[in-house]
Swiss-Prot record:
ATP binds at residues 50-57. Belongs to the ABC transporter superfamily. Phosphonates importer (TC 3.A.1.9.1) family. This is Phosphonates import ATP-binding protein PhnC 1. The gene is phnC1. Transmembrane segments: none annotated. It comes from Haloarcula marismortui (strain ATCC 43049 / DSM 3752 / JCM 8966 / VKM B-1809) (Halobacterium marismortui).
Amino acid sequence: MKSKYTARPEGKQSGQGLVFDSVTKRFGGKVAVRDVSLKLEAGERVAVIGPSGAGKTTLLRLAAGALQPDVGTVRFDGSSSTGSTATLAYQGETLVDRRTALSNVLTGRLGALSWLRGFIEPLLPQHPEPALERLDAVGLVGRADVPVKSLSAGERQRVAFARALMQDAEVVLADEPTANLDPSSRRNVIDVLDAALDGELLVTVLHEVDLALEHFDRIVGMADGRVRFDTPARAVTDDQLDALFAAGASTPGTDAERTGTEKESDIPVPWYV
């Protein structure tokens, strides 16, 4: 059944794109992203695919401003109509365990720093309907009053995603939003992502190539930190996919996301970006 969720106020004008200009990012001397140039337009649905360690998550964190490039620039391109330009929902995002799912999602409206999380309950909006709609969209409205610490890993991920959607950002970045979900829920989550947006740019890292090809307009294939192809979904070929994943398998020594002295996963990411 289609959710009643409508994520953006009527009349909101979105015109924000994202530009990577010759971007390189290193960790401990290892290159995670190398010489990437992309221009992503407002309203596009972009899936980033590739083998593990290809630089996909690093690319999203550069887009969110959680990481800075060593070479090149990342910038927003277009007119911004809100104070919140980009929101990042990534796998394993930290939630406040002792608070309920609803309380966590409500904090998505705030631009507070993470260290204030334990002190913000008095500031939470008194009308929970928008947060309940987002929980409904991810299939958790029946768990709204359950403390996050009692939720499964997949449920926690969906709560984090619902919270990110509360920010009314113009660029939405989702790192493996279908991870830890059962097969029947994966397509629902992708449908939720699409329905949530109205003119915003969506950039999603996915491991499920079939979902990427079915639900996204544009596919960016990454391996060894490089963009191997950037193609409309309808034009992606089996040969391109075979070469993409073969490239990742043949270059394990360049996997900076896993082998750098400063691992990407060790770098804290602000929950509010």
